[in-house]
């Protein structure tokens, strides 16, 4: 190894490469680990050094060299690589390995517009100093390499264009706790902050990505998911699409209750036109979901819900699978098929399920969620009404199709729209 190589430091100055310094960092990172070879990591990384290399690139090269050695026979390389990555992240965030005081860090980040100023409005300097005593930065060293990469990619506050990192893991955890308990009584809230911090930083509980990445920022993302109720009018459908884009950009996962949309061929404006059905509007929602990312953290994601008795259900159940063509598939959302006790009962008795367009059966969709007895009364009434468009399908065939698609895609969910379902009311042993 040529010890006359020049390296470019983070401040732009240059100096000769210091191999002893690299060795000391590796020695520190390997402490207490089993079956790891520092010299092996050094050999793999040294051959990639060149004159003028940045110190940050040296660090990333060493991290990759350690990560490449992870194997079933030598799993501790994952912790060696993780510790090196933590060291690198802290240097990027703070310019040094030791994190600053929590209060000083929060003040700086609020001034930069990276943290929500409510943190300084809700808590005093003394409270931040007390929170600082709760923090155990050594917990960073328990991460595996995969966990550190997840942390860096999804959760740490950062500039996703330039790659600048602004915090380390323990500040993330303590500030999420501070945000979540800020409205608790002053005399007890720090106890909750400490207990929550200890639980989340030792992996006893996990948090949704939107909260982990956004709750302490000006976005103030306290909810991980948003349910949007879509009506049957164009105004409501377009408002739903607009809300999807807005909430996806705010890091929220999306639930779309789209069961009110009328079926293909239904009359519009008294027969002036006929309806194009659900699928074009589902595609519209899918485009909205994928139009922007969840605050740069990950792509937008949505689950769309509709009732099992919808007239188009047989076409909707297959939207996720890999058969068919783009025109009759909407593959980039997940789906929830809403069922209730009556659907189960028809299955167990070997009877038919009758499919309707929600626009043709007034009150049925509302009763489906609000009053099961009223739903059953209306459902049987509409089944007998020959003036209403309908289709009868064997319950076992419909349930079989649903379960086949659920098994093949893994992304069809089955919420039961009956909160008082009891085991003795439906013989579930026959399911």
Which residues make up each language-model segment?
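Conserved, charged catalytic cores of large soluble enzymes
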Residues: 96-158, 164-186, 261, 270-284, ...
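Structured core elements
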Residues: 6, 16, 226-228, 255-257, ...
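Flexible, glycine/charged-enriched surface loops at secondary-structure junctions
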Residues: 36-42, 56, 72-80, 187-192, ...
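Long, structured ligand/cofactor-binding scaffold of large enzymes
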Residues: 143, 149-286, 290
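Generic, well-ordered alpha-helical scaffold segments in large soluble proteins
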Residues: 25, 29, 44, 48, ...
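Often metal-dependent polyanion-binding catalytic scaffolds in large enzymes
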Residues: 1-19, 23-166, 391, 403
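Conserved small/polar residues in nucleotide/adenosyl-binding loops
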Residues: 419-426
């Amino acid at each position: 190894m040529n010890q006359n190589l020049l390296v470019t430091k983070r401040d732009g100055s240059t100096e000769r490469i210091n191999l002893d310094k690299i060795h000391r960092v590796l020695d520190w990172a390997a402490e207490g680990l089993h079956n790891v070879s520092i010299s092996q990591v050094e050999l793999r990384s040294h051959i990639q050094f060149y004159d003028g290399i940045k110190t940050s690139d040296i660090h990333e090269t060493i991290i990759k060299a350690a990560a490449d050695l992870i194997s079933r026979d030598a799993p501790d390389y994952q912790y060696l690589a993780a510790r090196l990555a933590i060291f690198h992240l802290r240097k990027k965030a703070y310019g040094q390995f030791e994190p600053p005081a929590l209060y000083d860090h929060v003040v700086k980040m609020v001034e930069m517009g990276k943290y929500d100023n409510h943190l300084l409005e809700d808590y005093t300097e003394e409270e931040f100093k007390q929170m600082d005593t709760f923090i155990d930065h050594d917990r960073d060293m328990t991460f595996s390499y995969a966990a550190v990469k997840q942390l860096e990619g999804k959760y740490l506050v950062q500039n996703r264009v330039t790659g600048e990192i602004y915090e380390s893991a323990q500040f993330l955890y303590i500030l999420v706790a501070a945000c979540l308990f800020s409205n608790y009584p002053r005399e007890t809230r720090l106890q909750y902050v400490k207990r929550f911090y200890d639980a989340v930083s030792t992996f006893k509980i996990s948090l949704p990505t939107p909260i982990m990445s956004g709750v302490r920022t000006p976005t103030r993302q306290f909810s991980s998911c948003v349910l949007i109720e879509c009506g049957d009018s164009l105004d409501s459908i377009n408002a739903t699409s607009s809300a999807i884009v807005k909430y996806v950009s705010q890091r929220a996962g999306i639930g779309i209750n789209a069961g009110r949309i009328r079926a293909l061929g239904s009359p519009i404006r008294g027969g002036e036109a006929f309806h194009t059905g659900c699928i074009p509007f589902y595609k519209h929602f899918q485009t909205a979901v994928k139009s922007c990312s969840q605050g740069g953290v990950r792509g937008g994601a949505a689950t769309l819900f509709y009732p099992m008795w919808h007239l188009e259900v047989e076409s909707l159940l297959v939207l996720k699978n890999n058969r068919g063509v783009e025109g009759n598939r909407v593959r980039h959302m997940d789906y929830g098929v809403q069922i209730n006790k009556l659907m189960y009962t028809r299955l167990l008795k070997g009877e038919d399920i009758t499919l309707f367009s929600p626009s043709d059966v007034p009150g049925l969709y509302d009763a489906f969620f609000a009053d099961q007895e009223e739903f059953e009364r209306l459902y049987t009434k509409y089944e007998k009404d020959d003036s209403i468009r309908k289709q009868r399908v064997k319950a076992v065939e419909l349930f079989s199709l649903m379960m086949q698609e659920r098994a093949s895609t893994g992304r069809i969910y089955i919420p039961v729209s009956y909160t008082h379902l009891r085991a003795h009311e439906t013989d579930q042993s026959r399911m």
